[in-house]
Amino acid sequence: MAGKKHVFNSKILNHSPVEQTGVEERTIRFTKRSIKGSSKMQGLHMILSMIDLTTLEGKDTPGKVNQLCTKARHLHDHIPGLPTVAAICVYPSMVSVAKKALQGSSIKVASVATAFPSGQSSLRIKLADTRLAVTEGADEIDMVISRGKFHAGEYAYVFDEIAAVKEACGKARLKVI
């Protein structure tokens, strides 16, 4: 993995500052709370502005992506003041279609990469997938980690993989899923 070398510190995994009883008590309190009036609307606006509208089917077509982009651009037409969604999320092969359809809007184009949805591929393939999405115009990359390596306790491998993908993103934002 070329470029800036990041060092994984495994000691962070040995420190667990979570107090289980406190988490459970707060969870119960949150489930009983009711948000009312303008606070509820502010919350809904905030949620909408953070959502990615997504089409990630094997049968995606440029027409389907264009349709989703049109929906995203005009979602707020009937309710003045409603924010747009944060992004449209597509496969790397559909990034340029979404980018063109969203031109002139503030809506970002996100792309899954790194062998979505399984993450079961070599680092070389994951980096190529990421670079393709960025080259096609993706503003954000949704990365799937090597879950098998993570569950096997190979955290340094996963850390290095994330660092390499981040480097391949260039200026695009990386989101690890």
Region locations from a protein language model:
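Conserved active-site and cofactor/substrate-binding residues in soluble primary-metabolism enzymes
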Residues: 18, 42, 59-67, 89, ...
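Charged, compositionally biased N-terminal leader segments and the immediate start
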Residues: 1-49
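Alpha-helix-loop-beta-strand connector modules within alpha/beta enzyme cores
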Residues: 92-115, 153-175
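Active-site mouth loops of central-metabolism enzymes
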Residues: 30, 34, 50-62, 110-127, ...
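Hydrophobic, well-structured mid-protein blocks that either form specific transmembrane helices
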Residues: 125-177
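Conserved alpha/beta-domain cores
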Residues: 57-75, 79-113, 120-121
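Hydrophobic faces of well-ordered beta-strands that scaffold small-molecule active sites
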Residues: 46-54, 86-90, 109-114, 141-143, ...
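ATP-dependent carboxylate/acyl-activation modules
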Residues: 34, 56, 70, 139-140
